[in-house]
């Protein structure tokens, strides 16, 4: 709806900028429903429902299956009488599609039935009329996909898009109408019963062509008109569409996007139950107290997920290099990338079902930083071939429907991040995937880096602090001979694999939350999706920084880590370490260097008296010289004036006159 505040604005043409805004708004409104489906993980099985709608908009036929999107193209078999039910132009205007399945509908119009028997018209109310439908030829004309001139020539709904000959693209007519660009072919199906026993004895058989299988706009639907090649050319309109659904997430709260945001919950302090002293039993049967039921665990907030990443990184790092975790800071970056992939080798396995796949994400995350050397599948472009140590072909069969990566690895594909590959979706001539180990983008800083930054926040450092990522540290922490980088992550010792387990669990939780947030933002057309998608992690870290749970170092949110693990109140720990370091620094100062620290009022007093004292000293030093020069200058000027006055009163005589 467009609201106009002033009637005079009707005469003004809309500017090009306003037209662009209107087009963008309309594209968001009409494309919002499709956007959520187009960006799903193409390898994840979804519930696919092919539907056939009648001219009244009712769903008269549908077929469901759980398959990856755009891989299942069944034959559609709606019945003609189900399509014409409820139309005034046919003999069953009062029936629904389900009621038209009866052999003899109730409340029959015998006068109309007599005309059908006498004149041989088509209909669905009686067996003889339905038999004539089975014996009649038909042709089909599309509504969509035509040029503007073809649309004018073929007409609209009043002619069922078959206004002139040559508009038909499919059917069973004797001239066999065909088309190289249409999305479907329509023929006669095989009835399940005779027209005397059922009202549905005229099924159609709709099959998808190769252009139809490549078409990706089935979510909005496509419409055709079907007409019978008999007197009057009666017909009906039908629409085909695809519905892709998945189990909806459960959301509690007024805002589905930000309901789960917040800092990590405080761990409640559980008081220890005092152990009673042992005494001689008064009775042979001791009294057993039932333990209270464990409280239900709430879903993790954003703070819990981020802190879980840091804690998992500490466990993995402590397993490989314990000395590095004695006293350090692990920092999360405010800006992307939040994850990095390391290409890895390893054995892959085939599976006939997706039960072993970790379907948590929807393929919306793209890795911007992938390094290493690992296993590749498909046609890898030249820009990514340096990541491939070995490229293998994909074996697709009934027993090889899904390809699983090695232990807790992922597939980084051109279509997105996925835990499994569907062999029916993967196109070896166009698609490619790289087996990677996923590692969060966490920076490592020694303990002194943040202390120096907070002790002198305004001073300009001569050298930037050195940042090491978690992937580099894990590679460097493995013994020599095993390798670094991706090889360390795959072939590392047992303690590294144990340390990576908790990190992988934390990453799976965080990735699932990030992908769900993106899906919710796409569903909400009123939110600033692009801005929030870029700053969502930054907002989460801002919650932690403002709550004192982490310390800020430029664009990073840092957690203090020692051998006991990551500290939740890192800002308080930083202040304690700064105070301790300041006290140690004051103890090492000499007696004259600590004056200002011992007497705070001395700084104010000296700064107030220093200015006047320096000015007075300057006057006493330079004042006599300035005064002497000034007096000498005045005397010279006065003498010059006197000489001029004397010359003006007296005249000089020549020597001859004097003689």
From Swiss-Prot:
The chain crosses the membrane at residues 607-627. Residues 628-659 are cytoplasmic. A lipid is attached at residue 625 (S-palmitoyl cysteine). Specific enzymatic cleavages in vivo yield mature proteins. Envelope glycoproteins are synthesized as an inactive precursor that is N-glycosylated and processed likely by host cell furin or by a furin-like protease in the Golgi to yield the mature SU and TM proteins. The cleavage site between SU and TM requires the minimal sequence [KR]-X-[KR]-R. The R-peptide is released from the C-terminus of the cytoplasmic tail of the TM protein upon particle formation as a result of proteolytic cleavage by the viral protease. Cleavage of this peptide is required for TM to become fusogenic. InterPro entries: FMuLV_rcpt-bd, TLV/ENV_coat_polyprotein. Keywords: Cleavage on pair of basic residues, Coiled coil, Disulfide bond, Fusion of virus membrane with host cell membrane, Fusion of virus membrane with host membrane, Glycoprotein, Host cell membrane, Host membrane, Host-virus interaction, Lipoprotein, Membrane, Palmitate, Signal, Transmembrane, Transmembrane helix, Viral attachment to host cell, Viral envelope protein, Viral penetration into host cytoplasm, Virion, Virus entry into host cell. Residues 278-301 are annotated as: Disordered. Residues 466-486 are annotated as: Fusion peptide. Koala retrovirus is both a circulating virus and an endogenous retrovirus of koala, except in some isolated populations in south Australia. The surface protein (SU) attaches the virus to the host cell by binding to its receptor. This interaction triggers the refolding of the transmembrane protein (TM) and is thought to activate its fusogenic potential by unmasking its fusion peptide. Fusion occurs at the host cell plasma membrane. The transmembrane protein (TM) acts as a class I viral fusion protein. Under the current model, the protein has at least 3 conformational states: pre-fusion native state, pre-hairpin intermediate state, and post-fusion hairpin state. During viral and target cell membrane fusion, the coiled coil regions (heptad repeats) assume a trimer-of-hairpins structure, positioning the fusion peptide in close proximity to the C-terminal region of the ectodomain. The formation of this structure appears to drive apposition and subsequent fusion of viral and target cell membranes. The mature envelope protein (Env) consists of a trimer of SU-TM heterodimers attached by a labile interchain disulfide bond. This is Envelope glycoprotein. It comes from Koala retrovirus (KoRV).
